[in-house]
């Protein structure tokens, strides 16, 4: 019997940002470039149904609505920011929620523009995640994504995770849940300065523990490199697999350099500019 495979997304709206809209847009690109089914877990299923419908998804899983969130600032370029809730809890529930034997977990602001990640389903690796990353500006300090803190362990991105259902991987995701529940203990143990819970940190700590508290081979590298733009940058234009970014100049607040990508999948951290582009794209369908 062949194994089932697909992409899994979470979408929890926070009053400032429409993650459901992001998920709908990303699902369309996943079907186009990766050609695999997409499942969505959301706390806004009625909004999804009434606004966009569910045709873009293989399965929609209803999550309980909660106001629990981490407050943080969301930037829209260098000169604008808004405070909102960051509903990033329970990402590790993907192991139990996913209907697939082989799952590619993605953030909704990870804009697929090629078929590179389709190769993970043919890989022999049971757990894959990005450690290698690159700022598309190629000109800014990237140290914050090397370690979870200056003198702590290696940083891994929870933005993209591939896993197969197995007892070992169940142990990993149960461990991430435990780290989330006891975050303040693990934050102090691993010398993380920020009080804000981040899945990147929790996944990094869990990988360190799974490796026996030393460098190891539990997590294998996803294909390619995790490219990203900061929330101080602006996604300005999109045309199929081409994107134009205004990348903030370091030490020159409010000044930008235009950077164009083609066929490059990018983690777009400025979700406001992403939303403006999505509105244009969906209006043109």
PLM segments and residue spans:
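A glycosyltransferase accessory/donor-loop signature
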Residues: 1-11, 20-21, 40, 51-56, ...
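Glycine-rich phosphate-binding "P-loop"
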Residues: 4-18, 67-78
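Short, acidic, metal-binding catalytic loop of nucleotide-sugar glycosyltransferases
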Residues: 26-36
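Residues at the starts of beta-strands that form the adenosine-phosphate
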Residues: 36-38, 102
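Short, polar loop motifs at secondary-structure junctions
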Residues: 42-48, 65, 112-114
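Active-site-proximal specificity loops/subdomain of glycosyltransferases
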Residues: 47-98
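GT-A fold catalytic core of metal-dependent nucleotide-sugar glycosyltransferases
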Residues: 87-138
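Conserved catalytic core of nucleotide-sugar-dependent glycosyltransferases
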Residues: 120-182
């Amino acid at each position: 019997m062949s194994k089932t495979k697909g992409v899994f997304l979470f979408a929890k709206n926070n009053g400032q940002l429409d993650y459901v809209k992001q998920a709908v847009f990303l699902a369309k690109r996943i079907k186009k470039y990766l050609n695999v089914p997409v499942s969505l877990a959301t706390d806004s299923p009625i909004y999804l149904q009434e606004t966009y419908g569910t045709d873009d998804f293989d399965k929609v899983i209803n999550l309980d609505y909660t106001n629990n969130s981490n407050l943080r600032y969301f930037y829209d370029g260098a000169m604008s920011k808004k405070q909102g809730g960051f509903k990033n809890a329970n990402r590790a529930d993907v192991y139990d929620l996913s209907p697939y034997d082989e799952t590619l977990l993605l953030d909704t602001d990870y804009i697929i523009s090629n078929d590179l990640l389709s190769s993970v389903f043919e890989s022999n690796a049971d757990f894959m995640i990005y450690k290698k990353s690159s700022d598309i500006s190629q000109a800014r300090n990237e140290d914050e994504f090397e370690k979870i803190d200056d003198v702590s362990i290696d940083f891994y991105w929870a933005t993209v995770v591939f896993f197969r259902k197995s007892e070992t991987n169940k142990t990993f995701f149960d461990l991430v849940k435990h780290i989330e529940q006891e975050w303040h203990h693990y934050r102090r143990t691993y010398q993380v300065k920020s009080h804000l819970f981040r899945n990147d940190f929790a996944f990094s700590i869990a990988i360190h523990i799974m490796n026996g508290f030393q460098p190891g081979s539990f997590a294998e590298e996803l294909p390619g490199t995790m490219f990203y733009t900061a929330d101080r940058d602006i996604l300005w234009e999109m045309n199929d697999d081409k994107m134009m970014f205004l990348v903030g100049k370091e030490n020159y607040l409010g000044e930008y350099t235009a950077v164009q990508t083609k066929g490059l999948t990018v983690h777009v951290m400025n979700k406001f500019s992403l939303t403006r582009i999505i509105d244009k794209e969906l209006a043109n369908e």
